[in-house]
Amino acid sequence: MSLKLGSKATVVVSSANVAREVLQKYDQMFSGRSVTGAAHTLDHHMVSMVWLPVSSQWRNLRKMCKENIFATQRLDTSQGLRQEKLQELRDYLHRSSVSRKAVNVGGAAFTTSLNLISRTLFSKDFADYDSDSSQELQEIVWGVMKNVGAFNLSDYFPVLRVIDPQGIMRDAKFYFQKLFDIFDDIINERLQVRGTSETKKNDLLEALLDHSIKNEFEFGRNDLKHLLLVSVNLITFNKLVGYKHTCLKPLSMYN
């Protein structure tokens, strides 16, 4: 079945046989996707593994993610880190129980996942249970994910892109830049440490910096930041989608 959604032609596959043809026989032809307006923010679509068409650049990025993020060995070695972060959450809940302090369940869960992600990527904690820093980072990360995935009239009627009636392009640029500023600070800090110490961190940033130095013309600092953005979004989505509404609508628990 073929549908016309605004200016976009859409094909709906409704049978198993046709789906098999599309996904197996003609997968290269159908592997591309329409790039949303928000994905054009800071030229993200030109260097992002999510939006690039199948090409040598896309294959190289996928290989880097496979080796440095989703490799079985790396996932196995992070088991101790997961246990550590869950223990920190348990200790926080225990302290709150003893002091009879209200607990924002969504906020505590987000802080746990955020620190697990940041330790995996950058070997440092981003947030603390007793501070408001996790709330700000939560808004930035969800701001990026929400605007990139939001229904945007401009994607179906390109003539509206100039006026941006829903403000999605404006908001996407704001949150993208906020996250990139954080990445810049982290990268600068790591480069300073690398310049004064021979000890290396065993995290994604270290691996990407090594690759960037060896392949400066193929994978520069801008590419590095965009790949970090994709990594944060992928891991965050997998970990947080189960309690998204809890995070957005805080639930307080009194002990």
Which stretches of residues belong to each language-model region?
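Short clusters of hydrophobic/aromatic residues that line enzyme substrate/ligand-binding pockets
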Residues: 30, 49, 208
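N-terminal membrane-proximal hinge/A-helix region immediately C-terminal to the signal-anchor transmembrane segment
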Residues: 1-45, 56, 60, 83-91
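Short gly/ser-rich anion-binding loops that grip negatively charged ligand groups
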Residues: 48-51, 72, 76, 107
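Residues that form ligand- and interface-recognition hot spots within folded domains
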Residues: 5-7, 16-17, 53, 223, ...
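A generic structural signal for alpha-helix starts
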Residues: 17, 56, 73, 237-238
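Cytochrome P450 heme-thiolate monooxygenase catalytic core
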Residues: 34-42, 76-253
